């Protein structure tokens, strides 16, 4: 569940809401109504109305809609000769008159479908000079709200005496943004929401990648920092008008949030207290953080520190890892105490047993982590390694070398030990790192992050590894494709899918760990028992644990299958069957073969032969890790060649699919994708390549006077290069 932002806590007490939708939200291309977008907003407002909120809508769009209709009418009534003449600009007030009826007709139709009554309320600025008018307006709106009617306000542009350019000549209101602010004050609203075509107020034009979204507007801080871009071509005011209206309302006592009308459920998110859009509040200056560090700042700092790390010698980088390993062991008691608090809190909160199991750092875990960090330190330095060397032409040498990817964003759930593995891999590979762990491991992640960053020398800086503590920062981070180079999610299918659908940054990872063990008819019973038990029970919550047991059909006749099942049942494993196995073994039939239990449970099914097992794995598996138990080498080779998974084993537990056990030192995750890295991802998976060319003044000059040799040259190992003085 997404956490409530503390600065938005007032939202829980909101009763009366004014929502203003701008022309850019109401209309789409060509000035026509954006039916889908507007319909989604109406559904949110109807739901709020049903939940007891008092909803007031201020809607722009009449002029734009009317202009579109009048242009069509003008086209229909024009001759070909008329169309060759310069076209006169349509009168805005006539457009407003025509468009208002169409706009209101849409609202009536849409809200009627949602069983909500609406009322049209057209006002002009001059009306508000009359005290009696304002009093009557308030009484009328209150009466409507008591009957669950939604008033729909708009300025009556058709009869307004104001002319373009629109200015605040009267001090009352000058567009629908300022009208919404005025109404929120007059009608004593608890909140004003201004819906725009952008996510909120930025420090510069939203199209500029360096512009930052301002989550909380602080007048004293931001009013001189903001550079406004061009306003919408459809509307009148743009962001400048919205900010001015928001400041007026906020300092009059009504909180304001500017957010996108394009994003689904944004109104509902605002009222749940989530950090969307930009908040304007009269007390905002009291909430300003001591250090205003944005997601972009964290990513940029991580990149700068990574460049300092790469500039160190191989021995210095190795020493950092040894220092981290030592620091982990020295602080073992403190780490364990914080982890115990996380585990106790998770159990008290009623988290699933599988999640709690992943959260626990068992005795000896810190020592094991320290050992893996030391193993990683002693591996060959991966940075700057020459992978290929080519003589392009005489005295023109080209080298393909290994290089860090840049800045990594790792989002992981539950397992705090993953933080240590990921951080050590990032340091060894020379990458900057941003980490976001699950809130259930908050204390464990915080202490591990502190221990690790304290061990990093000042010449590099602790900002090499940033710890993201608020879930609300993740959407911001996923937009930073110019400063974050790779995202690696480690967690549930839902988490991985959400991240893949929310970013342009390349994503490396797997959504499911549905691992199979297939026991062939020639498999040895004792070996099968050991492998199946280990694959399921060594760590049931692991992504490389067995989730489906496939058995050759011949084994159901000789008692082999019964013996296997007995072993699992006596060890507390809950069994679910496919159609054949459930009938044979009298166990519940599984709802889906594509299911990751992450607990002491698994699916069992009987297949015809190795080809049936392969087909089952391809249809229902996740391309993670699959194993065959057989003494028939020919059958084993068929399985190993044809199963299209990241890791395929013969007579070995799926639990071996692990970076540490593969000798990678540690792993940042397991990838089931087919691009860049596959299987357990260690240091190699966090590297890319660069091309280094050394010449003696050669130029292309149309390839005249140069003879390409493209001769492969021997690549010296690093130790050989040092010995030869290269």
Curated annotation (Swiss-Prot):
GO-annotated biological processes: embryo development ending in seed dormancy; L-proline biosynthetic process; pollen development; proline biosynthetic process
GO cellular component, one term: plasmodesma
Pathway: Amino-acid biosynthesis; L-proline biosynthesis; L-glutamate 5-semialdehyde from L-glutamate: step 1/2; Amino-acid biosynthesis; L-proline biosynthesis; L-glutamate 5-semialdehyde from L-glutamate: step 2/2
InterPro entries linked to this entry: AceGlu_kinase-like_sf, Ald_DH/histidinol_DH, Ald_DH_C, Ald_DH_N, Aldehyde_DH_dom, Asp/Glu/Uridylate_kinase, G-glutamylP_reductase_CS, G5K_ProBA
Binding annotation for ATP: 196-197, 236-242
EC number: 2.7.2.11, 1.2.1.41
Keyword terms, alphabetized: Amino-acid biosynthesis, ATP-binding, Kinase, Multifunctional enzyme, NADP, Nucleotide-binding, Oxidoreductase, Proline biosynthesis, Transferase
Catalysed transformations (reactions): L-glutamate + ATP = L-glutamyl 5-phosphate + ADP; L-glutamate 5-semialdehyde + phosphate + NADP(+) = L-glutamyl 5-phosphate + NADPH + H(+)
Region (Glutamate 5-kinase): 1-296
Molecular function GO terms recorded: ATP binding; glutamate 5-kinase activity; glutamate-5-semialdehyde dehydrogenase activity
Binding site for substrate: 60, 157, 176
Cross-referenced NCBIfam families: P5CS (TIGR01092), PRK00197.1 (NF001221), proA (TIGR00407), proB (TIGR01027)
Function: P5CS plays a key role in proline biosynthesis, leading to osmoregulation in plants.
Family listed: In the N-terminal section; belongs to the glutamate 5-kinase family. In the C-terminal section; belongs to the gamma-glutamyl phosphate reductase family.
Name of the protein described by the UniProt record: Delta-1-pyrroline-5-carboxylate synthase B
Organism, as annotated: Arabidopsis thaliana
UniProt gene name: P5CSB
């Amino acid at each position: 569940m997404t956490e409530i932002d503390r600065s938005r806590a007032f939202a829980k007490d909101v009763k009366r809401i004014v929502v203003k939708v701008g022309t850019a939200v109401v209309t789409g291309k060509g000035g026509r109504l954006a039916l889908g977008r507007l319909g989604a907003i109406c559904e949110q407002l109807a739901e709020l109305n049903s939940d007891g909120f008092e909803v007031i809508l201020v809607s722009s769009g009449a002029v734009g809609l009317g202009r579109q209709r009048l242009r069509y009418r003008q086209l229909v009534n024009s001759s070909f000769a008329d169309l060759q003449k310069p076209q006169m600009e349509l009168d805005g007030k006539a457009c407003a008159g025509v468009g208002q009826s169409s706009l209101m007709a849409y609202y009536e139709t849409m809200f009627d479908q949602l069983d909500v009554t609406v009322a049209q309320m057209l006002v002009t600025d001059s009306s508000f000079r009359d005290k009696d008018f304002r009093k009557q307006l308030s009484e009328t709106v209150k009466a409507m709200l008591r009957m669950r009617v939604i008033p729909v306000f708009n300025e009556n542009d058709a009869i307004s005496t104001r002319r373009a350019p629109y200015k605040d000549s009267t001090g009352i209101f000058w567009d629908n943004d300022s009208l919404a602010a005025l109404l929120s004050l007059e009608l004593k609203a608890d909140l004003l929401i201004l819906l725009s075509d952008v996510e909120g107020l930025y420090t510069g034009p939203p199209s500029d990648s360096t512009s930052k979204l301002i989550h909380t507007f602080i007048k004293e801080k931001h009013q001189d920092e903001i550079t406004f871009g061009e306003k919408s071509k459809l509307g009148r005011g743009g962001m400048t008008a919205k900010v001015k209206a928001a400041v007026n309302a906020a300092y009059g006592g009504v909180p304001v949030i500017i957010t996108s009308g394009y994003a689904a459920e944004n109104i509902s998110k605002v009222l749940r207290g989530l950090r969307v859009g930009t908040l304007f509040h009269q007390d905002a200056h009291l909430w300003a953080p001591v250090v205003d560090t944005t997601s972009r700042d964290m990513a940029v700092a991580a990149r700068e520190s990574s460049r300092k790390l790469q500039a160190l010698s191989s021995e210095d980088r190795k020493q950092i890892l040894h220092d981290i390993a030592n620091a982990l062991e020295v602080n073992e008691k403190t780490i364990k105490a914080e982890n115990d608090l996380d585990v106790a809190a998770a159990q008290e909160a009623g988290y699933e047993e599988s999640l709690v199991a992943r959260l626990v750092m068992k005795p000896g875990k810190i020592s094991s982590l320290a050992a893996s960090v030391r193993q990683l330190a002693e591996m060959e330095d991966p940075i700057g390694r020459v992978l290929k060397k080519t003589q392009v032409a005489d005295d023109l040498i080209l080298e393909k070398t290994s290089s860090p990817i840049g800045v990594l964003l790792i989002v992981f759930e539950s397992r705090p030990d993953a933080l240590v593995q990921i951080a050590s891999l990032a340091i060894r590979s020379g990458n900057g790192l941003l980490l976001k762990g699950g809130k259930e491991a908050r204390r464990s992640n915080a202490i591990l992050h502190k221990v690790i960053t304290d061990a990093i020398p000042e010449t590099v800086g602790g900002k090499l590894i940033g710890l993201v503590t608020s879930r609300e920062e993740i959407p911001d981070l996923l937009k930073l494709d110019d400063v974050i180079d790779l995202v690696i999610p480690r967690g549930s299918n839902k988490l991985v899918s959400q991240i893949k659908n929310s970013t342009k940054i390349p994503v490396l990872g797997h959504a499911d760990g549905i691992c199979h063990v297939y026991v062939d008819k020639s498999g040895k019973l004792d070996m099968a028992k050991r492998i199946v038990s280990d694959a399921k029970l060594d760590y049931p919550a692991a992504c490389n644990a067995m989730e489906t047991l496939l058995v050759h059909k011949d084994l159901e006749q000789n008692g082999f299958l019964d013996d296997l099942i007995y072993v699992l049942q006596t060890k507390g494993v809950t069994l679910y069957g496919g159609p054949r196995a459930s009938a044979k073994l009298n166990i519940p039939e599984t709802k889906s073969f594509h299911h990751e239990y992450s607990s002491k449970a698994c699916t069992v099914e009987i297949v015809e032969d190795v080809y049936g097992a392969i087909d089952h794995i391809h249809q229902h598996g996740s391309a993670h890790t699959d194993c065959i138990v057989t003494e028939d080498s020919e059958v084993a080779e068929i399985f190993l060649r044809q199963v299209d998974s990241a890791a395929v084993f013969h007579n070995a537990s799926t639990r071996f699919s692990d970076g540490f056990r593969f000798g990678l030192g540690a792993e940042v995750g397991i990838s089931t994708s087919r691009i860049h890295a596959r299987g357990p991802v260690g240091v190699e998976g966090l590297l890319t390549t660069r091309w280094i060319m050394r010449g003696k003044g050669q130029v292309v000059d149309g390839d005249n006077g140069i003879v390409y040799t493209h001769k492969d040259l021997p690549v010296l190992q690093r130790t050989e290069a040092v010995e030869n003085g290269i």
